[in-house]
Design a protein with these regions (language model features):
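A solvent-exposed interaction/effector surface
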Residues: 1-210
Length: 210
């Protein structure tokens, strides 16, 4: 059976549309970093996320080649995720998207080591005749967070974020966004196929005890 992160880790990919507290364990990702409005034409965001999928599929499809990965199992490539922040702002200013910094990520199974990642970069560069040097191997220990499934357009996220923060305070926590802990989005829906009103996005904010 093909391993599906969305089914095996429902608490991470299918939370309810009401806030909850979760402890997210350390995981490996492939990632790209950039800046600017993600919706702008020819944005770094649109250009860079297209670099992630060939690497993810090279690892997934390695089963058909000569390169054998220790502990390999077949898997569904997980949803795209994103860390977002703006310099000098503790949170997200949706009215000033040009100042966004981002790390876009796709989670990888634990058998994906730095060595496996480097093989995938080399193999994909050779096959695609394209530069994948912006893609990096990224290990992240997210820790304690408040999260909620946001249903609707991205521009309506502040409504869900406000509910998350109210719940967080009620439970005795406070926001802990820092230089290493970010506003986190997990894109469950394919924006190309679903109307904005039905988009599902997991929103996650780092927290700490008061």
């Amino acid at each position: 059976m093909v391993f599906d992160f969305k089914k095996e880790y429902k608490e991470l990919y299918k939370p309810k549309a009401k806030p909850s507290i979760i402890n997210v364990e350390k995981a490996n990702f492939i990632a790209v970093r950039g800046v600017g409005d993600p919706n702008a034409e020819n944005s770094e965001y649109k250009q860079f996320i297209s670099l992630l999928y060939p690497i993810a599929y090279a690892i997934k499809m390695s089963k058909k080649g000569d390169y054998k990965i220790d502990g390999y199992f077949d898997f569904v490539v997980p949803p795209l995720e994103g860390f977002w922040w703006q310099e000098g702002i503790k949170g997200v200013d949706y009215a000033n998207k040009d100042s966004f910094n981002f790390i876009s990520l796709i989670r990888m199974p634990d058998f994906v080591t730095k060595e496996v990642f480097e093989w995938a970069i080399e193999e994909t560069t050779r096959k695609k005749k394209k530069d994948f040097s912006k893609v990096e191997f990224f290990t992240y220990d997210e820790g304690l967070c408040v999260q909620c499934m946001h249903i609707g357009p991205y521009n309506d996220e502040p409504i869900t974020v406000e509910a998350m923060h109210e719940y967080m305070i009620e439970q005795g926590y406070e926001l802990d966004i820092t230089d290493e802990r970010f506003h986190h989005e997990v894109y469950i829906s394919d924006v190309r196929k679903i109307s904005p009103e039905k988009l599902k996005t997991v929103l996650r904010h780092p927290i700490k005890k008061k």
